[in-house]
Amino acid sequence: MKPHIVARINGEPFALVQHDVRLELRTPGRANLTTKSPSALRGLVTLDLGYNDKALHRHFVGYVERCTTANSQEQVLLCREVAAVLDYPLPMALRHVDLRAVLVEVSRVTGLRFRVPDAPYARVRVPYFYSLGGGVQAMDSLAQVFNIPDFIWHQQGDGEVFVGRWADSYWGVRPALQLPVELFDGYQGNHSAEIASLPGLRPGAMINQGQRITAVTLTGTQMVLKWKKP
């Protein structure tokens, strides 16, 4: 079966010629899209993936960072997930804050929406939170500042950014996905393989014997998965 991919810019569908979409844990994803369009394109980009008449799953939410004209009828788009705003400098000096208060400030500056579980570490207050680097560095530092075990942060399919312990995430509260051996088209080392596209599969998912997906690359009708043992 061939997957059904629906691509939109600012809510309007557009024809895809080819696509390469790369999602990772703790790093904003990116997409290279070639589209049918005689003129340059800008704005919010979404990609939904599904099979036949099944419900579509949102695979990518981002924006056009750069548009290059390939020929008179095609444009090449370099897109980033909305969380890519965290690549920019994000200095902060906050006093007497908990995890949610830090993320409220990040949201105020970046416009991002965060999802934080109702867990003890989310209620711990620290004397100060200090960061002079970029947003990614600030997000990574949350694990140590708030003593969060098995910490992850990543953009979800709905555009929100989950922040917390992996076990409290969408995938952490679900059993491992059992992917049959025949689904894998080829292994690329001990921690990577190519499979037919699976709608809804994203970094953070756990498969088979506890392997945790760290990266998903969607190209054409195939996905390349990378994983690690936690």
Residue ranges and their predicted role:
Residues 1-25, 107-110, 159-186:
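Short beta-strand/loop turn elements enriched in aromatics
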Residues 33, 94-114, 130-155, 204:
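Amphipathic, non-transmembrane alpha-helical segments in extracytoplasmic/periplasmic proteins
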